[in-house]
Amino acid sequence: MLSVIILAAGKGTRMHSSLPKTLHTICGEPMLFYILEVAFSISNDVHLVLHHQQERIKEAVSKRFKGVIFHAQIVEKYSGTGGAIMQENKTPIPTQHERVLILNADMPLITKDALTPLLESHNNAIGLLHLADPKGYGRVILENHQVKKIVEEKDANDEEKTIKSVNAGVYFFERKFLERYLPKLHDQNAQKEYYLTDLIALGIKGNEKIDAIFLEEECFLGVNSQTERAKAEEIMLERLRKNAMDLGVVMQLPSSIYLEKGVSFKGECVLEQGVRLIGNCLIENARIKAYSVIEESQIINSSVGPFAHARPKSVICDSHVGNFVETKNAKLQGTKAGHLSYLGDCEIGKNTNVGAGVITCNYDGKKKHQTIIGENVFIGSDSQLVAPINIGSNVLIGSGTTITKDIPSGSLSLSRTPQTNIENGYFKFFKKP
C-alpha cells in the first residue's frame, strides 16, 4: 500500500476569483474532488495540505469524502511545495505507509491508469512530461533513465534548453527518503520558499536513485487560470461524451453537447445538438431534443424538447414535453405538454393533455404550493391553475380558464366571461374627434 499527500495550499491568484482554486468546477465537480477520488482508489491513507481558505475547502471536502486527513501548511516558516509536506522542525507529514505519492490538487484530469507507470517504480521517482514546446519549464536532465539534475529555464544553457523533458509535479518517495532529506532542505532562493525539486537535487547529491517516469501530458495538465480550467473542462467533456457513446448513447454533433459528471444513461438514448445535462440526471430510453436543458432530473421513456427546460426535481416518465415547456419539481406520468407551458410543484397523472400556455401558479409571493392533477384530464390552452389546487380525474378545463378551486372528477370547468360582440365597435373606438 501507499500513502497520498495532495498539495492544496496555494492562493490561486491567477484565477481572479474569491472561490478557492481547487473548488472551481470541471463538468459540475470541484477539481479537487476528481483527484481525491483517484487518491482513495489507490490508498486508504489520504492527506490534504491546506492554507488559503482552508476552512472553506475542509467543509466542502468533508461533506463528500470521509477519512481525509487535513494538514495546515505552516507558511510563515515553511512556504513552497517542499514546505507543504513539512511539520515543525522540518519533519515530514507522518504517513501510514512507507511509500508516499505527492500530487497537486489542481490536476483534475489525473486517472488511476495514468499514475500506474509511476507507482510501478521500485525506487524514488519523479513524473516527467515530454513537451513539444517546453518554454517556461525547468528541464530535467537524464542519464540511464535516472534523473541527473533539474535545471530551471533561466539557468539552462543553450544545449539544455533543447531538452523536452520537464517536471510533471508528481513524486513517489520512500518515507525514509523524506525523513533523511527534508530536514536538509533550505529556502535560500529568490522566492524564499522550500521546493520539492530541491529535494530531488539533495537525493541525487546523496547518490540516491531517482527514476524518471514519463507520463501522459493530457492527464497532468495543471489548472492555474480560467483559460486552463476551460481547457481541462473540454478534455473532461470529451471523456464523458466518449463514455456515454460507448454505452450506446447517440449524440448529434457531440461537440455541442454539455454534460456533467453526475449524469447517467440507461437503455437507448438520443441527445440532439446543443443539449445541456446538468448535475445528477438519469436519462433512460429517452430522446432529448435540440437545445434543451435538463438539471438534476429524471427523464424516462420520454421525449423532451426542443428548447425545453427540466429544472431540478423533475421526474418525466412516459411523457412528451415539447417546445418551450419548463418544469420544476414536477412529476409527469404519461403526460403530454406540447408547448409554451410552466409546470412547477405539480403531479400530473396518465393520459393528461396540457394545452399551450398553461401555467401552474405555484408561488403566492411567500410560499410555494402544489398542484395535483389526476388522470385523463384535458387542460385547454391559456389556462392558469392557482395552487394549492387539486384536480380530479376525467376533467375537462376550457381554454382560457383560471382555476382557483378544486375540481371534482368528471367535471367540466369554465371561468370565462361570456363573449360580447358590439356592432360597429371598431369604428366607434377609432372615431376621430
Curated annotation (Swiss-Prot):
PROSITE patterns with a match to the protein in the record: HEXAPEP_TRANSFERASES
Positions with a binding annotation for UDP-N-acetyl-alpha-D-glucosamine: 7-10, 21, 80-81, 138, 152, 167, 224, 311, 328, 342, 353
Region annotated Pyrophosphorylase, chain positions: 1-226
Recorded GO CC terms: cytoplasm; membrane
Subunit (UniProt): Homotrimer.
GO biological process: cell morphogenesis; cell wall organization; lipid A biosynthetic process; peptidoglycan biosynthetic process; regulation of cell shape; UDP-N-acetylglucosamine biosynthetic process
Protein name, per record: Bifunctional protein GlmU
Gene Ontology MF annotations: glucosamine-1-phosphate N-acetyltransferase activity; magnesium ion binding; UDP-N-acetylglucosamine diphosphorylase activity
Primary site of residence: cytoplasm
Region (Linker) residue spans: 227-247
